[in-house]
């Protein structure tokens, strides 16, 4: 057993595989999720060091629960990438993607002012049909992330009601099933129109 770690973290249980609609879905563990966040932070730091003075955009897909990769997340990730690429276009210095079991990630190093980029990304989150399912972080060259409120946008709203999303998450206002059902509806509507 690793020193200083609780037994459950030193010997994590293997991921649970689930069959649904003839697809095998992998549930991730809390340890995997936490490790992926650390790895994402390391990737962000490394990219900013390799490209000093540039802005970093990081995409992750909003997907509650222990299954982070499925048919819906692939549709959401492709739509987000296309929207971001369309906005950033020739300003992109580097694009890097990571389709990990813990969720899809994409990174763009951009030659543009961070606040302007953050406003564009907030516009995508607010106005793209699937934008509520995109998490588009903009990180300044000094590794400081910009929030929506930093650039004059309101905090993100809940998928199901008009409350601030953070408030509903913190208070467990909606069940995971309700949220996943709304995501399913959004992706089906998007697919029907595209």
Language-model regions, residue ranges each:
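Short glycine/threonine-rich loop-to-helix capping motif typified by GTGT followed
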Residues: 71, 108-111
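Long, contiguous binding/interaction regions
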Residues: 18-85, 99, 119-194
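Helix N-cap motif at beta-to-alpha junctions
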Residues: 111-117
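Non-transmembrane, aqueous-exposed alpha-helical and coiled segments at domain scale
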Residues: 84-94, 103-107
């Amino acid at each position: 057993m690793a020193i200083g770690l609780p037994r459950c973290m030193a010997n994590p249980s293997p991921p649970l595989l689930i069959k649904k609609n003839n697809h095998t879905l992998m549930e991730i563990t809390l340890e995997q999720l936490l490790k992926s966040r650390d790895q994402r932070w390391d990737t962000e730091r490394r990219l900013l060091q390799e490209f000093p003075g540039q802005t970093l955009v990081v995409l992750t897909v909003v997907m509650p629960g222990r299954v982070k990769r499925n048919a819906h997340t692939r549709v959401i990730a492709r739509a987000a990438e296309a929207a971001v690429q369309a906005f950033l276009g020739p300003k992109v210095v580097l694009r890097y993607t990571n389709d990990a079991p813990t969720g899809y990630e994409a990174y763009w190093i951009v030659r543009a002012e961070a606040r302007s980029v953050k406003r564009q990304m907030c516009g995508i989150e607010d106005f793209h049909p699937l934008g509520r399912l995109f998490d588009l972080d903009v990180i300044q060259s000094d590794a400081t992330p910009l929030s929506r409120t930093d650039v004059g946008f309101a905090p993100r709203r809940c998928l199901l009601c008009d409350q601030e999303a953070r408030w509903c998450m913190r208070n467990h206002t909606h069940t995971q099933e309700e949220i996943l059902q709304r995501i399913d509806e959004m992706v089906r509507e998007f697919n029907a129109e595209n």
